[in-house]
Amino acid sequence: DFTKRMGVIRFRKRDDRESDGQVKGGWGPPVALLYRSGPSSAMHIGKSVEQLADWLVSFDPSYLLAYPSIMNPLMDAVAARGGRPPSLEEVRLISEPVDPELQSRLATEWQVRCTDLYSANEVGYIAFRCREQGALHVQSESLLVEVLDDAGQPCAPGATGRVVVTSLHNLATPLLRYEIGDYAEVGAPCACG
């Protein structure tokens, strides 16, 4: 629901950090091009856990976008302030692997959905976790993802290789077969289709 509050904890450019914690009138581009959205607020990941917890409790978003590595300390700090953000419905985790224990903790202690998004600064969202099977689905509408072995050949299902991406929508600086430094295991086709 784009009309609800969105909170973001992630790396922010130095110029953007001056607005840490300020409430803005929408979620920003590209959402603003398609939908009218509710208020948003962002904090730089470099803030102290105490500052992030105070902001989260005060802003009380419905959705939180953050890195997995900050969530356990953040949950501990919020618990020390009396529990959980009451309006929070979903935590969207980006850029790092998500530990199953963290997913379980979010579901148990905060009673929220946890969405795992595989992403990279260079290309944005790469894949979303399937709610039916748990595998990651590549966002093939916006990029081509290859998992290549040491010889530069596509890996077979079950094999691990280097992640190479080609952005299909970046008109300013096209990334062609860009190796992002990650490794992934190729899965079998998902039963969801």
Feature locations, PLM:
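Conserved AMP-binding loop of ANL adenylate-forming enzymes
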Residues: D1-L33, P39-M43
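Active-site glycine/GP-rich loop and adjacent strand/helix microenvironment
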Residues: L34-G193
